Regions:
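Bacterial N-terminal signal peptides
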Residues: 8-17
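Bacterial N-terminal signal peptides that target proteins for export
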Residues: 1-8
Length: 355
């Protein structure tokens, strides 16, 4: 029987204590098999004094304030929802179009446990001009749309000309195959989105989505954050903008191309390869997953994000790294306060009037 996975903001299926997961081969046959086999459980090693000292430095980063440029910042310990989240009267309000995609028709992810239905939610701003290629956000886990968080933010910020007139494409994950989709360090998920999701979005909504990578942003939290960076890293010709909360840049799902999973980003990919035209906003929380785990395990979310930020700085990327005090993994109160300003940073340089 088909299942409908309605995944909203607070639902993050990250296994913080599991052993490393070997990736399946990125082929339709593998994607439709029995799912990824998990490696043996391995006990976590306690963080060393040096690890804890490195993490402690994050609390002393300068405060993240409106207008902050590139660099490393901190926020908290107290939080309040951003005013942009509140629905305003007297401004144009976008509409929400929703439909289901049945995995049985997918050549990439037909379902590890059989066919299922995946919800796709599309925000279309009232100012969108039919036929004009629209910049857009692609978001994992249907982040923030069904509870109107992101829709309200976009309504308000588009009306105030702080963001371009943009579409938001929110796609539910594949349930039991979420890690296969998001944690696999390869172009497979990005290609799935390009060939199977975005064409359906255009067909169902009548919206034309831009092919300009400057007008495309990938967004997610936890493994979805890793997915967002993976989409832009492997398909830079399609995505130049990335937004990540508590990104799972750790050794979670291995493959020959990525022996240490998404930890390859801070460890090898960014250090060893030429600078790509990416603009990245990334976050990690004080009490994020694995915060007391040794850096040598490559399973400490705080240290992994901290090290990725360090590499981005050294390589000269446009990036912001925000460390949130008194907060946990993909903490809703942090997102509620920071998302509008994060979006504004990520979309810097893109004309508000569009292209």
């Amino acid at each position: 029987m088909n299942r409908r996975f309605l995944i909203v903001l607070g639902m993050c299926f990250v296994i913080g204590s599991a052993g490393r997961i070997p990736a399946q081969a990125p082929t339709p046959a593998a994607a439709g098999g029995q799912g990824a086999g998990r490696g043996g459980q391995r006990p976590a090693t306690v963080a060393t004094p040096e690890d804890l000292a490195d993490i402690a430095k994050l609390a002393n980063l300068p405060a993240w304030v409106k207008g902050s440029g590139d660099g490393d910042f901190s926020t908290g310990p107290d939080y309040a929802p951003a005013p942009e989240e509140t629905q305003r009267v007297g401004i144009p309000h976008g509409k929400l179009v929703e439909f289901f995609v049945n995995s049985a028709s997918s050549k990439v992810f037909p379902g590890v446990n059989g066919p299922f239905e995946r919800l796709v939610s599309v925000y279309i701003p009232a100012q969108y001009v039919l036929g004009r290629p629209a910049p857009f956000i692609f978001a994992a886990d249907s982040y923030g749309l069904r509870d109107r968080q992101l829709a309200n933010i976009l309504d308000n910020m588009i009306a105030d000309r702080r963001l371009p007139v943009m579409v938001a494409v929110m796609v539910a994950n594949g349930g039991p195959q979420r890690s296969l989709e998001y944690d696999t360090v390869s172009p497979v998920f990005a290609d799935f989105v390009e060939t199977e999701i975005l064409p359906r979005v255009e067909k169902e909504t009548g919206v034309k989505l831009t092919t300009d990578p400057e007008g495309r942003m990938a967004y997610g939290g936890s493994s979805g954050g890793a997915m967002a960076l993976t989409m832009a890293w492997f398909r830079t010709e399609r995505y130049h903008r990335v937004l990540s909360y508590s990104g799972t840049f750790v050794d979670l799902r291995e493959s020959p191309e990525a022996p240490h999973g998404a930890y390859e980003y801070p460890e090898h990919f960014f250090p060893d390869q030429p600078v790509k035209p990416l603009r990245i906003w990334m976050h990690v929380s004080e009490n994020d997953l694995g915060a007391k785990t040794a850096s040598a395990d490559r399973r400490n979310w705080v240290i992994a994000n901290q090290r990725l930020a360090g590499v981005l700085k050294a390589k000269g990327y446009h990036y912001q790294f925000v460390y949130s005090k008194n907060s946990g993994h993909v903490d809703k109160k942090v997102i509620s306060q920071t998302l509008p300003q994060a979006l504004e940073y990520v979309w810097q340089g893109y004309p508000v009037s569009g292209k």
